[in-house]
From Swiss-Prot:
PROSITE patterns: FGGY_KINASES_1, FGGY_KINASES_2. Inhibited by fructose 1,6-bisphosphate (FBP). It comes from the Bacteria. It catalyses: glycerol + ATP = sn-glycerol 3-phosphate + ADP + H(+). Pfam families: FGGY_C, FGGY_N. It comes from Xylella fastidiosa (strain M12). This is Glycerol kinase. SUPFAM superfamilies: Actin-like ATPase domain. Glycerol binds at residues 83-84, 135, 245-246. NCBIfam families: glycerol_kin, PRK00047.1. Key enzyme in the regulation of glycerol uptake and metabolism. Catalyzes the phosphorylation of glycerol to yield sn-glycerol 3-phosphate. GO terms for molecular function: ATP binding; glycerol kinase activity. The lineage of its organism: Bacteria, Pseudomonadati, Pseudomonadota, Gammaproteobacteria, Lysobacterales.
Length: 499
């Protein structure tokens, strides 16, 4: 039968999606299912790994039922996932020994503090390109092994398996036959040497984690195994692509050359710049990460993570009740010609790149009696653009590459005011992608390359299309004046201590 589709499984922090793409990279069907978030203590975030798989299976079933396609027309499956989230399970039974600890969770902060005090930060940064932070998988693995009954003994005997969510999904889809991850996900674990391309024995010793629990690390585009579940009507479909969500979005945006960058405007912002086959060490508060591994070669990226972006709009809507729908924010911002001197620094959970200060909290500056709701909303939207410039400035300094354009996706950038202001503050064109689901598209592309569904990256570049291009309209003097005000507001925020 002719292969007409690639299936992408996009497993995110709050929901799972199954999306079908055709040969032109167009969406032909989609299903989505949310699952329960677990908050055992303040700052802790967990998922039931079984709930994740149930949501994956449900979306596959709904998609196939809704589209009525012949399963045999699916050439392959690509998987993209919330990164860093950690699962450990029993190899024999397939049962998790504890909940999945989510990337957002801060429950391993004490472990990070102890390792930093012990002097391990430089070792971690040199080998992994990351920081000693609870964000990454390594300390989550240690926490589970330390707290689950008899876990260290079982792990040492090789009875347990660790995986990020991609690994957990593939294990289940293949009936427990395949225990793998890809370079992009391995590079986010705090245990993988991104230069030597191996699980690092020094880092494993530091964390007291036995190598026996680790998955094989493979390229981001190859056939890892075949499905062995009833959800595909008994058909064995190749699982052929893996990438962490932000790297998948970089691939889906066709950022294939050094200096090309994308920014995803979701709850937070994740900006990645392709740096080619060279791992660029950041001296400006960014992360060095593996973008993907293809055709025997590794390509790298610089990443800046902004903790609060689109969620500032949710705060205005739900917390302050300034408007009824998130989309109303654009109309409020457009009613005033400027921010009225108001700056919102949305450090609700601290500041991410390039500051990395988890101890600071949000602040608002410049309020007067003439400040209106419209000024406040505009200032909150502007904060996303300022934070993106903070990250871009660090990227350009680290990579010594001048950005020519910024490719964007995510819900917040559908706001035309936000997109135009972003272009003005960066002084570069902002290109909004025609397809919003660039993360899933990236996973589909990787699977399509491995199965021959697509022939080359050049073919994918031809498929990439712009919804709209926003070009800078602000003069340099005004741009720098506004950004100077932001830097002053951030400096004041960093200096404030909560009693």
């Amino acid at each position: 039968m002719k292969k007409k589709y690639i299936l992408a499984i996009d497993q995110g922090t709050t929901s799972s999606r199954a999306i079908l793409f055709d040969h032109k990279g167009r969406i032909t069907g989609m299903a989505q299912r949310e699952f329960t978030q677990i908050f055992p203590q303040p700052g802790w975030v967990e998922h039931n790994p079984r709930d994740i798989m149930t949501s994956v299976y449900t979306t596959i079933t709904e998609l196939l039922n809704n589209t009525q396609i012949d399963v045999r027309a699916i050439a392959g499956i690509g998987i993209t996932n919330q990164r860093e989230t950690t699962v450990i399970w029993n190899r024999q039974t397939g049962q998790p020994i504890y909940n999945a600890i989510v990337w957002q969770s801060r429950q391993t902060k004490n472990i990070c503090d102890q390792l930093t005090t012990a002097g391990y930060q430089d070792l971690v940064h040199a080998k992994t390109g990351l920081l000693m932070d609870a964000y990454f998988s390594g300390t989550k693995v240690k926490w589970i092994l330390d707290h689950a009954e008899n876990a260290h003994t079982q792990a040492a005997r090789g009875e347990l398996a660790f995986g990020t969510i991609d690994t957990w999904i593939i294990w289940n889809l293949t009936g427990g036959q395949v225990h793998v991850t890809d370079y992009s996900n391995a590079s986010r674990t705090l245990m993988y040497d991104i230069h030597a391309l191996r699980w690092d024995p020094d880092l494993l010793t530091m964390l007291d984690i036995p190598a026996a629990i680790l998955p094989d690390v493979r390229s981001s585009s190859e056939i890892y195994g075949l499905t062995q579940t009833p959800y595909f009507h008994g058909e064995q479909i190749p699982i052929a692509g893996i990438a962490g969500d932000q790297q998948a979005a970089l691939f889906g945006q066709a950022c294939f050359e050094p200096g090309m960058a994308k920014n995803t405007y979701g709850t937070g912002c994740f900006m990645l710049m392709h740096t080619g086959k060279k791992a660029v060490e950041s001296k400006n508060g960014l992360l060095t990460t593996i973008a993907w591994g293809l055709n025997g070669e590794i390509e790298y990226a610089l990443e800046g993570s902004i903790f609060i972006a689109g969620s500032v709009v949710q705060w205005l809507r739900d917390g302050l009740r300034m408007f009824g729908k998130a989309s109303d924010s654009q109309a409020y911002a457009d009613r005033v010609s400027d921010n009225g001197g108001v700056y919102v620094v949305p450090a609700f959970v601290g500041l991410g790149a390039p500051y990395w200060r988890s101890d600071v909290r949000g602040a608002v500056f410049g309020l007067t009696r003439s400040t209106t709701k419209e000024h406040f909303v505009r200032a909150a939207l502007e904060s996303m653009a300022y934070q993106t410039r903070d990250v871009l400035s660090a990227m350009q300094a680290d990579a010594d590459i001048e950005l020519k354009e910024l490719r964007t996706d995510g819900a917040a950038i559908t706001n035309d005011f936000m997109a135009q202001f972003q272009s003005d503050i960066l002084a570069v064109p902002v290109l909004r992608s025609q397809i919003a689901e660039t993360t899933a598209l990236g996973a589909a592309y990787l699977a399509g390359l491995a199965t021959g569904f697509w022939s080359s990256r050049e073919e994918m570049t031809q498929h990439w299309a712009i919804n709209r291009c926003f070009k800078p309209q602000m003069d340099k003097e005004q741009r720098e004046h506004l950004y100077a005000g932001w830097k002053q507001a951030v400096a004041a925020t960093l200096g404030f201590r909560v009693a």
